[in-house]
C-alpha cells in the first residue's frame, strides 16, 4: 500500500509561503510514496505544474464535473486533464458537482472525452456538498456510470461524509467495490461545524471504516500537519497510516 500526502494537509498559509514543490520535497523526506497536488492552492499554475512534473500521483481539481443545473462542464474537465497531463500525474480527482437524473445522457460524452486522454484516470471523490457528498448521490452516480460502461473509480474521503450528516461506515460498506483511493481524515465537532483532525484524534469509527475499504489501494493523509519540525511530524503520520492500515 502506498501512503500519499494531500498537500492541503500543510495548510493554505504554508503552501502559499513555500509552494507545493517545496511541500512535495518535504513529503519525500518524510517517507511518503507520493503527493496529491491541489489545484486550489496553486499560485502560478503555468510555472508550478511543469516544475512538479513526474512528482505527483494525483492532481486534485477544485471544480465539479457537472454544473449546478446538471450540465457536464467540459471546460472544467479539460482544465483538470490538462493539469494532470502537465504534472504527468496518472490520476485526476474531481467531484460530481450537480450531477442528477438529467445528467445521465452526458455520460456518453464524458466517456468519449476520457477515451481521448487515456494517460489520465479520472477518480470521483465524495466532497462536503449536498449534491456530491451524500451516499444516495454517490450511489446514483456510480450506478449510472456503470450502466454507461465507464468503470470509474472512487476516492473515498473518510471524513467528508460528516459535513452532510452521513455515516462513513455505511458509505464504506456500500461503495467499497468502487474505491481505488482513500483519503484518511479524522473529524471532531466544534460549535456549529466539523473540523479535520488526525485519525488518532477522530470521534468517528475510523478503524471500522478502514476495515470496510480495500487495503491495497493508495491511502492519503488529508488532515492538518503542523509543528516546528514538519518533516518529523509528517514522518510520524505516514508511519501511523501504514500501521493503522496493517492493523485494520
Describe the role of every protein-language-model region:
Residues 1-31, 78, 82-88, 109, ...:
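Histidine-acidic metal/acid-base catalytic patches
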Residues 3, 29-108, 121, 160, ...:
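Structural motif corresponding to the early beta-alpha repeats
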Residues 43, 98, 126, 188-190, ...:
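Intrinsically disordered, low-complexity segments enriched in polar/charged small residues
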Residues 47-52, 113, 236-240:
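Short, aromatic/basic amphipathic alpha-helical patches
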Residues 97-142:
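Hydrophobic, well-structured mid-protein blocks that either form specific transmembrane helices
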